[in-house]
């Protein structure tokens, strides 16, 4: 068996940050300072997934799949606002003053890492099965890029260099089994994931 899918990815992210400081000393004329930051990220992209599954014998099945990076085109829209409040008004009776930045717009591209997965399963008739999955993801393939429609846009060379230095190829192994005894079913699993940062591993134990 062989399968192919093309995915369409939509992105919308909103972040609102509010920071307020109030003076407790009433002898100070400045009463309160408030800072607000708004960020909206929108965009989309595509990805491709392809896989092959074969039955080696009546009991043994093997497969392999490839998940391409997500190729994303994103746009950030942001602005900031600051408000100061005083205890005594000015000559026009105003206690507060507010200043806003102009709206900022920044377009860029993001590529996520690809992933390859190989799997095998042994089916012991109606009694149970054992499955093994091996995956590999190269986090060094994450990339940032400027907007192709804008000449001389920022190329993210520094950021991509940091990704190459701090990330590495990550592997994972998962083993699962299920067995039947009468009306009872017993399940267990074990997994090992290599951290995308070099030098540390994360292990998840077994269960039933």
How should these model regions be labeled?
Residues 1-208:
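Outer-membrane beta-barrel porins/channels
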């Amino acid at each position: 068996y062989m399968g192919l899918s093309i995915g369409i990815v939509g992105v919308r992210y909103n972040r609102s940050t509010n920071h307020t400081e109030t003076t407790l000393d009433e002898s100070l004329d400045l009463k309160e300072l408030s800072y607000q930051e708004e960020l909206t990220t929108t965009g989309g992209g595509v990805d491709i997934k392809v896989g092959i599954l074969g039955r080696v014998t009546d009991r043994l099945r093997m497969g392999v799949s490839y998940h391409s990076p997500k190729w994303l085109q994103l746009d950030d829209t942001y602005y900031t606002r600051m408000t100061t409040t005083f205890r005594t008004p000015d000559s026009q009776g105003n206690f507060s003053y507010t200043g806003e930045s102009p709206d900022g717009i920044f377009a860029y591209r993001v590529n996520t890492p690809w992933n390859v997965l190989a799997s095998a399963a042994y089916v012991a008739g109606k009694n149970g099965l054992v499955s093994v999955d091996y995956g590999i993801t190269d986090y060094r393939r994450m990339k940032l890029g400027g907007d192709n429609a804008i000449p001389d846009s920022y190329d993210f060379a520094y950021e991509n260099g940091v990704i190459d230095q701090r990330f590495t190829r990550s592997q994972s192994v998962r083993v699962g089994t299920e067995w039947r005894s009468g009306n009872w079913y017993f399940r267990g699993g074990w997994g090992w994931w290599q951290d995308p940062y070099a030098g540390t591993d994360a292990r998840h134990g077994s269960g039933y």
